[in-house]
């Protein structure tokens, strides 16, 4: 598996970079469409997106570097080399949210949770696309599997998951397909405009976290916090927080209707 798509002179263009760019591009188009449908000022929304994207990339990279500090402290020139892989989704969510929160606080006509709901389907779709970058880098896979097991997948998956004489769980594919399913669920909920703001976002957190928790248990490259897989710890916390948010938000909405 060659992670390089093509070369421009001395510059190598990686499939990982192409797929991340594609994920952001499609996500921006979709989110802008939903923003326009809901009467959001597109100039302000565009400015928000242009702030959130680099913040998300920086957050995703910093999160990954921090939990792999032993390697990066010895190889500091590798820290900005995101094209080699190493973007942590949870760090990206945190970085993007903090940047968006900062921007929205300075524009009182923008509503945080309404905008988060608009962005959530685009985010999970982008994650579904971006996971294929892991495939080309032959990373974020699970443990070894038998030839019989991997033969159930298409030939190109089998070839991509054949690494150093062994076949591996294509966990990138599991997560990509799960994220795609979550995307359609979020689109359905987003169309129900009677729901309070924030419900789509919290549904995203719950569904993504459920899938990530189970898929993470198969991976061999998990970021660790002591004996715990960090992604699973964050997933549990996200599920608890989002479930409580939805419960109290819907309860408040019903009391207002009465």
Describe the predicted segments one by one.
Residues 1-258:
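A feature for loop-to-transmembrane-helix boundaries and adjacent hydrophobic helices
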């Amino acid at each position: 598996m060659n992670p390089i798509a093509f070369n421009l002179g001395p510059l190598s263009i990686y499939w990982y970079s192409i797929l991340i760019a594609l994920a952001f591009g499609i996500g921006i188009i979709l989110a802008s469409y939903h923003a326009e449908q809901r009467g959001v000022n597109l100039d302000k929304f565009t400015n928000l997106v242009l702030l959130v994207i680099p913040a998300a990339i920086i957050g995703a990279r910093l999160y990954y570097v921090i939990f792999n500090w032993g390697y990066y402290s010895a190889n500091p020139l590798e820290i900005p080399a995101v094209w080699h892989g190493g973007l942590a989704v949870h760090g990206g969510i945190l970085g993007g949210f903090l940047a968006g929160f900062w921007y929205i606080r300075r524009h009182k006509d923008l509503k945080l949770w309404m905008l988060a709901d608009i962005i959530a389907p685009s985010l999970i779709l982008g994650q579904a696309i971006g996971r294929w970058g892991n495939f080309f880098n032959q990373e974020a896979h699970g443990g070894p599997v038998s030839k019989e097991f991997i033969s159930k997948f298409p030939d190109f998956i089998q070839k991509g998951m054949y690494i150093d004489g062994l076949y591996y769980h294509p966990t990138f594919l599991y997560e990509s397909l799960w994220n795609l399913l979550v995307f359609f669920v979020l689109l359905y909920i987003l169309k129900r405009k009677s729901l309070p703001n924030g419900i789509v976002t919290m549904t995203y957190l719950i569904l993504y976290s459920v899938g990530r928790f189970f898929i993470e248990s198969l991976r061999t490259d998990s970021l660790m916090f002591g004996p715990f897989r960090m992604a699973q710890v964050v997933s549990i916390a996200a599920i608890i927080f989002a479930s409580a948010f939805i419960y109290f938000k819907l309860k408040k909405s019903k009391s207002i209707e009465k």
